[in-house]
Amino acid sequence: MDLPGPIHDFLLVFLGSGLILGGLGVVLLPNPIYSAFSLGLVLVCTSLFYILSNSHFVAAAQLLIYVGAINVLILFAVMFMNGSEYYKDFHLWTIGDGVTSMVCTSIFVSLITTIPDTSWYGIIWTTKSNQIIEQDLISNSQQIGIHLSTDFFLPFELISIILLVALIGAIAVARQ
């Protein structure tokens, strides 16, 4: 989106705080249904980030696939489980939580120290001048379709097979 600077910055901060709060909700809430709803908030905020960066197709795919299908499937699976097993012997802080928080904190600190020192200019993709003219004539969704049917044909087919196996497994579990 082409927004003025202060509005764009406000939306970035707002969506970033939504991502952080939703992520904390996924990890820290003891009720798995609330965690699944927090995951939905994280996925919606991620798709709004895609909209802010002018990737409308990726945002629509994020909403349809992850929020509309995966998160609903997670909620469906959680609602099939017995809810009483989550509240037995609930401790506020365990040794595993401490180890996990130490690992996550060390990864966070290493990222914070590494990211400012990285030269990002060499990572930006460069294209030839004739490719820029060709890319202007084709829309983003057409480019994605061309890449999926040519360059990424094998990974696309492997993902479809994995999703088919997951669907067959879900049907088998639902029948029992």
Curated annotation (Swiss-Prot):
Q: How does it assemble?
A: NDH is composed of at least 16 different subunits, 5 of which are encoded in the nucleus.
Q: Which reaction does it catalyse?
A: a plastoquinone + NADH + (n+1) H(+)(in) = a plastoquinol + NAD(+) + n H(+)(out); a plastoquinone + NADPH + (n+1) H(+)(in) = a plastoquinol + NADP(+) + n H(+)(out)
The record's family statement is:
Belongs to the complex I subunit 6 family.
Its name, as the record gives it, is: NAD(P)H-quinone oxidoreductase subunit 6, chloroplastic
The subcellular location is:
Plastid, Chloroplast thylakoid membrane
**TM spans (from-to):** 10-30, 32-52, 61-81, 92-112, 152-172
Q: What does this protein do?
A: NDH shuttles electrons from NAD(P)H:plastoquinone, via FMN and iron-sulfur (Fe-S) centers, to quinones in the photosynthetic chain and possibly in a chloroplast respiratory chain. The immediate electron acceptor for the enzyme in this species is believed to be plastoquinone. Couples the redox reaction to proton translocation, and thus conserves the redox energy in a proton gradient.
* One matching Pfam family: Oxidored_q3
Q: Which GO terms describe its molecular function?
A: NADH dehydrogenase (ubiquinone) activity; quinone binding
Q: From what superkingdom does this record's organism come? A: Eukaryota
User: What Enzyme Commission number(s) apply to this enzyme?
Assistant: 7.1.1.-
* Keyword field: Chloroplast, Membrane, NAD, NADP, Plastid, Plastoquinone, Quinone, Thylakoid, Translocase, Transmembrane, Transmembrane helix, Transport
The protein's topology relative to the membrane is:
Multi-pass membrane protein
Q: Which GO terms describe its cellular component?
A: chloroplast thylakoid membrane
